Amino acid sequence: PIVRLVSTRMRAADLPLRLRYEAPVVRECQRNAGGSRQFTQLGFELIGAGDTAGDVEIVSLVAEAVRELVLPDARIIAGSVRPFKELLAACEDRELAAEALRCVHANDFVGLDARVAASAEPEAVKAAISELPRLHGGAEVLDRVDALLAVAGIVAPLTRELRALVEGLAPEDAQVLSFDFSIMNSFDYYTGLVFKAYAGGLPDPVGSGGRYDSIFTG
């Protein structure tokens, strides 16, 4: 709906656009899982901010929201789809690339390792595919991402946006941020940053989002 709104009624508007929406959402719950099938979803869209300043603005907004809600042990876990997708794009084994992405979407790391072990890809590439989605921690983990990609033959600065995010956040927002490269989201339209916000005692995220430039660029 947001894409349709922007491409029709707002196509002549000055960028960037800052939009907010609130709507009821119905989702299927697993049997006996408990909880409501309908809830209110509040969302924010920043459209036309193509640089890392947009990432900083949105993550800062999420951090402020969880702080204002006084959620216990609130934290934001971020990643990027770019390193893993670029790694898979470099694979000659296209079946491995497709299966590896499916396994990460499903959090099936046993299946991922089995599929990687059966591939004839170079060992450095196979090691990177297995390890990269397991990486998590503070900003120091970004160095390990770069090292894995470099050994696999990928030298593009694919963690640059995440480093800029850390540098651009206010100290109180950076304190609740960590990284996890298993966060890929099952929607293939994401093109860079992805994130989830959690609160203590709740197994599911209270918020999530990411960058999806390609939807608006064609």
Features from the language model and the residues they span:
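Positively charged, Gly/Ser-enriched RNA/tRNA-binding surfaces
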Residues: 1-72, 92, 115-218
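Short His/Asp/Glu-rich catalytic/ion-coordination signatures at enzyme active sites or charged loops
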Residues: 89
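Histidine (H) residue identity feature
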Residues: 73-75, 103-107, 136
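Glycine-rich, mobile lid/loop segments that gate access to catalytic sites or pores
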Residues: 75-86
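Acidic, His- and aromatic-enriched active-site or binding-groove loops in soluble protein domains
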Residues: 92-117, 121
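Functionally engaged cysteine thiol sites
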Residues: 29, 86, 101-103
